[in-house]
């Protein structure tokens, strides 16, 4: 280990100790049972109705009209934002007759002269179509086109198109009007009874695919009239009539017709097959119907609460029935009575009907997960000497890449991935390596690359679509609707924009001044608003375009019709957006945005692990469990594949990328390991693309040692690294989770939250703090477990190892209690503290101690810093060289230059280069061999910087001893590299590569013309 890195690590340890943060430990579990009557104290602020911004995006992006216009939308509604990824969108596109999937029912407009209106369909699990070609089924779907019952009326024909209005994130209203008559239905997700409101109309109830086996009038309810109808598939439906007097009669085996013109409403509900109690429950809750659903929410401690608040009509003295999905049944805590009525959902397991005007749910949230790796086991993130060295080396290589050129692509998706790669690199350098100089260089390069997009100068700029109201790429507006994965048609916006929001959060984290510079904040907020605007008070975007709070995850597809409804191909890019949004809210100080994202992430962990990731407690068919992930989840179908191929690494991997600190919150270690052992371990050696490294990075969640060994291998093949992935970050992620032989523990935000179980309750955790970092002396491998005997600024500590000075924990080292000086801990026998600044104690008996973190260079390897004065009296202990303190046992200060002491020899300075005076002499700023010394001569090159583009270096005789030289701001070994201006090029087999522009090249293969490489 180099003396540079040793000093660097000790400096980091000093800073880490001074900034110890609490590691959260479980002390007590608070269980909220389903249907309990606990009192919830809500905050004044509803984070689901907090405006992000109201700036008109057209003023930044300009505006266009979209080539696809909403079909059937009322004139008044056209002026408002229109949802583009919701269950009812098929009715706004194309022929408008495709299916609308409002779990647990399917609806569609049946355009007909004889049976026109809205069809209702529901199928049970035994009607599901399963893949029978494979031993492990790769797909299933629910049969479509079965019109169990439908609402119609005399006078509705194929020319009577429904008008859509009252469009919201969970509902829309459909109105058929003819002459002076109308039929109106509000369709919502989860509604247990379907209601049609009639005005001056003769109702018709029909089925275009089934026949009526039995139809009877049933007395004894609050309804004007009630009927029970049994269809030819043996399913039983109930019909309730409210309003004017009306009698239904069976006109044909497929049609019930009203006796007269009617003003009122009719409700239809399905009795689960064989359920003898459901009818009485429906009778209790009939008469009321839902016309709208609003969402509210807040965060309290480490729990996120969200509520569905229903707007109702009809008999509002009655609470409405509403179907809950499995992840909601597990977490409902207030406002509802869960009934025994159970219907199968489309692809999300069994649903329970619950009664209530407002239903509140509680989810454990990732409140303390930030930019550093997070351990799902509650372990401490730590790094060994070896890991830090390898991470630094790899990060230095990646830092040399051209951020701007690599991210200047013709796709928002791919550009975003590259930017996020470099964001993770900057996090690695800044938060883990603690290299301020390289961090500054990294973030400046990242800001420059990001600026192209803020300035809207990318290959395909963004524009504001004034038709549907959103920010889209221009790539597909004039021809290919699938350009950039359909971004122009609102497909995958959460996948695309999540990378940009995450990158912006990293920049704001490292350089807070950037946030309010120019249009940076507004531009990022435009993306947040496009994907997840929470409020109707923002007139420029629909609410929650890409997230379905009811289902607990996002939907894609946008403005494309689909028989099976919207779909989700990548769970991980879904939650990546909300992780980026959480961090962005944090760095800009928008606590409502941060809380909202935390709640959504808590919901997604629960929902995704029940429906799309086949973890313990998931609801998918047992026969499909060996697939481990759904693949593509449609509203009506699951198929174990991708849109771009059927390789197993594609199907599993698209649910992994990108690997960030939130990954382990969603993807538990047991799930990751089971998936690896069953599907991936046997094929990993045959994966010859960037997917291989992604699979290994994901493995770090369960087996960090194996992941680390892969990424730290000396023969690591960069061909197996995706363009959107940073090897330095993958190393930092795996090494931090492994924490083997750790000597350094970065300030961490680790927390332990208990996932909700499948037994109908949610477990949340209250926490207490213990010290999360310790000072390893002589590089002890792991923190020592000790007894707790003190409290310092909320952190408990062992008073035999630490002292509390003010609010800072400082160590006791060799019996000496270190003291606090403005956040830094110091040995009082070696330092003094004057006005918050450390200074050395001038004493001939001082000994070497921990040094402050040295300023490091752009190559990431920590190095000495040049100074402005000369210190002549050298001795061991801490000395002052200009404004920098250094360990005089390891460095020598000579003429504004810190040079190392190697093998007892004080190296001297010569025009920026450090040299061994027994081997070299310095004359007029140039080094030449010391001819007095007898050495074995070799050929090397002068380290003096040159200024030409492709210079021929001057060779000199030299010894085999290294010369430590400086090139620009980087230090290098002159036997391995040569400096051209500020460009370092390697020496390979004794021959130096030449420089051309910023590239190094072999002159036997290439030439250089005007700063560009050409064939030799």
Curated annotation (Swiss-Prot):
GO biological process, one term: cell wall polysaccharide catabolic process
Entry keywords, A to Z: Carbohydrate metabolism, Cell cycle, Cell division, Cell wall biogenesis/degradation, Glycoprotein, Glycosidase, Hydrolase, Polysaccharide degradation, Signal
Mutant phenotype after disruption: Decreases basal endo-1,3-beta-glucanase activity. Cells do not separate normally after cytokinesis resulting in chained cells.
GO cellular component terms, semicolon-separated: cell surface; division septum; extracellular region; mating projection actin fusion focus; primary cell septum
All copies of domain GH81, residue ranges: 45-741
Cited PANTHER family: ENDO-1,3(4)-BETA-GLUCANASE 1 (PTHR31983), PRIMARY SEPTUM GLUCAN ENDO-1,3-BETA-D-GLUCOSIDASE (PTHR31983:SF21)
Function: Cleaves internal linkages in 1,3-beta-glucan. Has a role in cell separation where it is required for the degradation of the primary septum after completion of cytokinesis.
Entry protein name: Primary septum glucan endo-1,3-beta-D-glucosidase
The gene coding this protein: eng1
């Amino acid at each position: 280990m180099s003396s540079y890195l040793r000093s660097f690590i000790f400096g980091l340890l000093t800073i880490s100790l001074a900034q110890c943060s609490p590691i959260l430990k479980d002390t007590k579990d608070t269980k909220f049972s389903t249907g309990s009557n606990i009192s919830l104290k809500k905050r004044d602020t509803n984070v689901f109705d907090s405006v992000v911004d109201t700036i008109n995006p057209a003023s930044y992006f300009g505006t266009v009209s979209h080539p696809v216009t909403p079909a059937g939308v009322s004139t008044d509604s056209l002026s408002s934002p229109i949802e583009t990824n919701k269950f009812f969108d098929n009715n706004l596109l194309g022929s408008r007759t495709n299916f609308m999937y409002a779990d647990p029912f399917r609806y569609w407009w049946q355009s007909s002269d004889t049976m026109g209106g809205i069809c209702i369909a529901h199928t049970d699990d035994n009607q599901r179509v399963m893949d029978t070609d494979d031993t492990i089924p790769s797909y299933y779907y629910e049969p479509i086109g079965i019109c169990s019952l439908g609402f119609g009326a005399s006078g509705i024909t194929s020319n009577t198109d429904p008008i859509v209005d009252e469009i919201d994130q969970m509902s829309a209203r459909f109105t058929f009007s003819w002459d002076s008559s109308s039929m109106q239905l509000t369709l919502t997700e989860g509604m247990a009874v379907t209601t049609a409101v009639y005005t001056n109309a003769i109702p018709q109830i029909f089925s275009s695919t089934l026949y009526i086996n039995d139809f009877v009038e049933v007395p004894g309810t609050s309804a004007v009239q009630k009927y029970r109808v049994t269809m030819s598939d043996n399913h039983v439906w109930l019909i309730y009539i409210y309003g004017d007097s009306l009698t239904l009669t069976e006109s044909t085996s497929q049609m019930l017709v009203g006796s007269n013109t009617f003003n009122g409403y009719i409700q239809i509900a399905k009795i689960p097959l064989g359920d003898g109690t459901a009818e009485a429950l429906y009778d209790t809750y009939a008469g009321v119907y839902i016309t709208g659903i609003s969402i509210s929410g807040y965060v309290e401690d480490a729990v996120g609460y969200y509520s569905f608040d229903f707007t109702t009509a009809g008999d509002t003295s009655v609470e409405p029935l509403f179907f809950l999905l499995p992840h909601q049944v597990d977490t409902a805590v207030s406002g509802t009575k869960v009934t025994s009525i159970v219907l199968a959902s489309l692809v999300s397991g069994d649903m329970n009907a619950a009664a209530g005007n407002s239903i509140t749910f509680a989810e454990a949230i990732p409140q303390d997960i930030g930019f550093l790796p997070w351990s799902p086991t509650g372990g401490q993130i730590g790094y060994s000497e070896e890991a830090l060295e390898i991470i630094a080396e790899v990060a230095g290589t990646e830092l040399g890449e051209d951020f701007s050129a690599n991210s200047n692509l013709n796709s928002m998706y791919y550009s975003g991935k590259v930017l996020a790669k470099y964001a993770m690199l900057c996090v690695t350098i800044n938060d883990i390596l603690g290299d301020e100089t390289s961090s500054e260089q990294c973030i400046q390069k990242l800001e420059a690359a990001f600026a192209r997009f803020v300035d809207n100068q990318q290959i395909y700029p963004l524009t504001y679509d004034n038709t549907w109201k959103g920010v889209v790429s221009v790539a597909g507006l004039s021809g290919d609707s699938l350009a950039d994965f359909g971004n122009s048609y609102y497909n995958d916006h959460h996948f695309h924009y999540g990378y940009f929001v995450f990158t912006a959060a990293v920049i704001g984290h490292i350089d807070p001044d950037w946030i309010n510079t120019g249009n940076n904040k507004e531009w990022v907020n435009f993306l947040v608003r496009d994907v997840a605007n929470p409020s109707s008070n923002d007139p420029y975007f629909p609410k929650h375009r890409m997230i379905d709070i009811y289902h607990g995850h996002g939907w894609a597809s946008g403005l494309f019709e689909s028989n099976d409804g919207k779909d989700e191909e990548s769970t991980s890019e879904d939650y990546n957006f909300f992780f980026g949004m959480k961090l962005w809210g944090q760095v800009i100080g928008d606590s409502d945005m941060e809380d909202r994202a935390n709640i959504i992430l808590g919901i997604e962990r629960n929902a995704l692990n029940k429906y799309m990731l086949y973890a313990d407690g998931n609801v998918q068919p047992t026969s499909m469990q060996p697939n481990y992930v759904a693949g593509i989840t449609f509203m009506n179908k699951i198929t174990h594949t991708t849109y771009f191929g059927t390789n197993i690494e594609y199907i599993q991997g698209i649910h992994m990328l990108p690997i960030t600190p939130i990954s382990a919150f969603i993807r538990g270690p047991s799930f990751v390991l089971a998936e690896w052992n069953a599907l991936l371990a046997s094929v990993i050696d045959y994966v010859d693309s960037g997917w291989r490294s992604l699979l290994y990075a994901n493995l770090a969640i369960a087996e960090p040692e194996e992941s680390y060994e892969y990424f730290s291998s000396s023969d690591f093949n960069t061909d197996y690294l995706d363009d959107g992935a940073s090897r330095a970050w993958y190393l930092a992620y795996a090494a931090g989770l492994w924490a083997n032989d750790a000597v350094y523990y970065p300030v961490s935000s680790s927390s332990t939250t208990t996932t909700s179980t499948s037994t109908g309750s949610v477990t949340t955790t209250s926490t207490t703090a213990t010290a999360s970092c310790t000072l390893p002396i002589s590089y002890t491998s792991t923190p020592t477990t000790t007894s707790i005997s003190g409290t310092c600024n909320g952190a408990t500590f062992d008073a035999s190892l630490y002292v509390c000075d003010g609010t800072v924990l400082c160590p006791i080292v060799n019996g000496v209690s270190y003291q606090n000086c403005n956040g830094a801990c110091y040995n009082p026998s070696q330092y003094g503290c004057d006005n918050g600044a450390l200074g050395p104690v001038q004493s001939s008996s001082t000994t070497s101690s921990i040094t402050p973190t040295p300023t490091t260079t752009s190559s990431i390897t920590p190095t000495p810093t040049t100074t402005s004065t000369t210190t002549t009296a050298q001795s061991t202990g801490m000395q002052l060289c200009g404004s920098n303190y250094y360990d005089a046992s390891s460095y020598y200060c000579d003429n504004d230059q810190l040079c190392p002491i190697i093998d007892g020899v004080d190296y001297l300075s010569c025009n920026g280069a450090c040299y061994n005076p027994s081997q070299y002499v310095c004359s007029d700023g140039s080094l030449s061999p010391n001819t007095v010394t007898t050495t074995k001569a070799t050929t090397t090159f002068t380290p003096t910087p040159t200024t030409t583009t492709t210079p021929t270096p001057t060779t000199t005789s030299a010894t085999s001893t290294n010369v430590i030289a400086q090139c620009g701001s980087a230090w290098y070994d002159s036997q391995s590299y040569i400096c051209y201006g500020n460009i370092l090029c390697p020496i390979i087999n004794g021959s130096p590569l030449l420089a051309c522009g910023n590239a190094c090249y072999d002159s036997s293969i290439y030439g250089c013309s005007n700063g560009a490489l050409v064939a030799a």
